[in-house]
Regions:
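N-terminal secretory signal peptides and thylakoid transit peptides that target proteins
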Residues: 1-15
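Substrate-binding cleft and catalytic face of glycoside hydrolase catalytic domains
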Residues: 68-72, 92-196, 202-204, 269-272
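Aromatic-rich peripheral "rim/lid" segments of glycoside hydrolase catalytic domains that contact
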Residues: 143, 152, 157-162, 166-174, ...
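Glycoside hydrolase catalytic-domain groove-lining segments
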Residues: 178-186, 190, 194-196, 211-216, ...
Length: 356
């Protein structure tokens, strides 16, 4: 997931984008469970502290058929300073998913943003670095090998602007960009042979240059024999990107024939660092629903075998990572349900798209 960085932006953002779109209104009347409408798994994320929230549980159990641990399956949580591994919180989420009868998706094994001190301290000792890297993947991916149906093996390898690939502790310790990604996938394949292994990134549809760089990387890895088995499209959508840009990327991504996971959907109503947004909220909602409708339509247009899952990065607006921190004014509404758990317009957009 996008962490410790500014809200989504695109060099192609247009202030006029969305003008004339159909009005965005919350659904009325009886609400059908989203998981009953969609012909594929519909996911959301969980933190262990949310599992006892009865209102959150009601929404999750009604509408979703897959769970991704939002943070507590990442290295930042699991790997301790002494090299030991902590599994208390991710185990609770795994048990919760099992008892609820929903799929569990693993996120994420290797991420440039989490260059843990345990690894930075040994980056110049190649044999030890390799051994510790392989041990970590073996123990983490192997722990839930009978339950987890897929993993984000490498998260966010492409530079923000699409100019290249991220230099990180993993590339330095394992001999280069391709080398670290290939090794991570090979080790994940050994540890979790039944899981579908994903390369996951953000802004692929928001920034065409980055989307193209990501797909070139996928092609190169496949030619090198890496067991990349799926494409993770995070879809933290910039609502101001031009119409058709999302569908264009999805059409390019489908050419590999790999399963595609919309893995972290949200759509902020804010401009995030650009000029103050003085437009009426209704206009921004229209843009938001139009872009999410385009994403859902593009996903529905994929061959059924390529529709791995469609995951929303949070349940209620108040659960969103976009609403955390001292600068949150409580006004953003990037998810399917509002703070009180009532459906937002985005819920109706997905219900309509998935029912076609």
């Amino acid at each position: 997931m996008i962490d410790r960085r500014a809200l989504l932006a695109s060099t192609l953002a247009l202030a006029s984008c969305g003008a004339g779109e159909a009005p965005a209104t919350p659904p009325t009347g009886p609400i059908r469970p989203l998981k009953a409408v969609a012909p594929f798994p519909v996911g959301t994320v969980a933190m262990s502290g949310q599992l006892s929230d009865q209102d959150w549980f009601r929404l999750v159990s009604t509408h979703f058929s897959q769970l991704t641990p939002e943070w507590e399956m990442k290295m930042e949580y699991i790997l301790q300073e002494d090299g030991s591994l902590r599994f208390d919180a991710p185990d609770r989420i795994a048990y919760f998913a099992r008892d609820l009868g929903v799929r569990l998706f693993g996120h994420a094994l290797i991420w440039y943003a989490q260059d843990h001190p345990w690894f930075t301290a040994i980056v110049n000792d190649r044999p030890r670095f390799i051994a510790e890297h392989d041990r970590y993947i073996a123990e983490v991916a192997g722990r839930w090998r009978s339950q987890i149906i897929g993993w984000d093996v490498v998260n966010e390898p492409v530079e923000d602007d699409g100019s290249g690939y991220r230099d990180c502790v993993w590339s330095r310790g394992l001999g280069g960009i391709d080398a670290y990604i290939i090794r991570a996938f090979e080790q994940a394949r050994i540890a979790a042979p039944e899981a579908t292994l994903f390369l996951n990134d953000y802004n692929l549809e928001n920034t065409p240059k980055k989307g193209a760089a990501f797909l070139r990387l996928v092609e190169r890895l496949l030619k090198a024999g890496a067991p990349v088995q799926g494409i993770g499209v995070q879809s933290h959508l910039d609502i101001e990107i031009p119409k058709g840009q999302i569908a264009s990327f999805m059409n390019e991504a489908r050419q590999f024939g790999l399963p595609i996971h919309v893995s972290e959907l949200d759509a902020s109503l804010k401009r995030g660092g650009r000029l103050p947004d003085l437009r009426p909220r209704a206009q921004r909602r229209e843009q938001q629903t139009a872009r999410v409708a385009e994403l859902a339509g593009a996903f529905m247009a994929l061959p059924p075998a390529q529709r791995f899952a469609f995951t929303v990065w949070g349940v209620r607006d108040s659960n969103s990572w976009l609403r955390r921190g001292e600068n949150d004014d409580g006004q953003d509404s990037p998810l399917l349900f509002n703070d009180e758990g009532r459906p937002n317009p985005l819920f109706g957009v997905l219900t309509e798209a998935f029912a076609r």
